[in-house]
């Protein structure tokens, strides 16, 4: 983060650097679980905030490690938050947020399911305070079933609608738009000119205009990762980060003037 004068009156403006990345519990396209190489990619951008999806805590496949703590250390950011959406291999699995700044509030909202056999999804919310700015951060990983994504988006908008207008909102994550699960580990992806999930969010927030594919796997590929931000901040630039096979997702980087 850097701070500079916003105008001749001396009002200060902050540059906030944000990344969102579905790390697939550290698993690369080669099958190796390696947080180090994922963190190395992110470190090059020196972010202030990192949204992570598909984080493990104390699972066998993660060698019983607390991945959010490990990733936090590897990207040199001292504060982190992770909430479990499901229990898995005697551990936990969910989403995380890593921050350069103290987290003053953290909660996880479990999303509705249309079938109890479907994977439980959640939306992790953190709040940080920078001077007079209150910043609400959301790490999102929506369902691979469209009906559940729409229900979850409606729940997300209910949460956002309760936030004061002068507070800042930044959402990052894997929205799975256009993805349909057709069986165990089988998916289809449909590219559309617009998605109902995005249309609902864009009534209140601004979406990054990223269009490059962010999901690559034997199961399919498409642009399903992005960020949204409130209208009281401005976007300086954004970039899709090639993860170099360290995950089946690319990361998204954005800079905001706050």
Regions found by a protein language model. Give the residues of each.
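Short active-site-adjacent helix-start/loop capping segments
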Residues: 58-61, 89-91
